[in-house]
């Protein structure tokens, strides 16, 4: 479980996370193109991840995302405690956040799109008006409206660009 994995990170210096963000993590090809195209059309963009806010908040700032949610690591004296704070972002939380933001923004769920790759994305994909499985596992692909198995995130935009 997420909590068990987080417990293994106990006493890891926060500086190690900075190294991972700067040198290890890479944006999926086409991410910047997709987000820029969405922004040109007034689309709100929300990142909901089972990962950690340390990374999603940086991505939100770097890419100009409207919203970002993830698991929040508890940090004391610059070190991880091995615990999470706040709500754990699991499959249900992802779907709930989609519904909450659609309601908050007065957008019918039928006008929302959710994209994911794993089983924990299925409730969100099913709650959305349109679900995209991106380089996804077979079970997730079976629950989506479309599947993108090759190429980058710009392929998502290309599905709608000429409609």
Residue ranges and their predicted role:
Residues 1-3:
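A phosphate-binding glycine/aspartate-rich beta-alpha loop in the early core of alpha/beta enzymes
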Residues 10, 14-163:
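C-terminal cap/substrate-recognition subdomain and adjoining C-terminal extension
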């Amino acid at each position: 479980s997420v909590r068990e994995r987080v417990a293994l990170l106990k006493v890891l210096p926060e500086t190690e996370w900075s190294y991972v963000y700067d040198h290890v993590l890479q944006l999926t090809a086409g991410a910047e193109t997709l987000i820029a195209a969405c922004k040109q059309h007034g689309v709100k963009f929300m990142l909901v991840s089972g990962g950690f806010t340390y990374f999603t908040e940086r991505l939100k700032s770097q890419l100009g995302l409207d919203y970002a949610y993830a698991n929040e690591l508890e940090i004391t004296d610059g070190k991880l405690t091995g615990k999470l704070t706040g709500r754990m972002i699991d499959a249900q939380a992802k779907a709930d956040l989609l519904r909450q933001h659609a309601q908050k923004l007065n957008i019918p769920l039928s006008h929302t799109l959710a994209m994911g790759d794993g089983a924990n994305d299925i409730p969100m994909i099913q709650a959305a008006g349109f679900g995209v499985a991106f380089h996804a596992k077979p079970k997730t692909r079976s629950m989506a409206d479309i599947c993108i198995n090759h190429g980058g995130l710009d392929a998502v935009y290309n599905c709608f660009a000429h409609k």
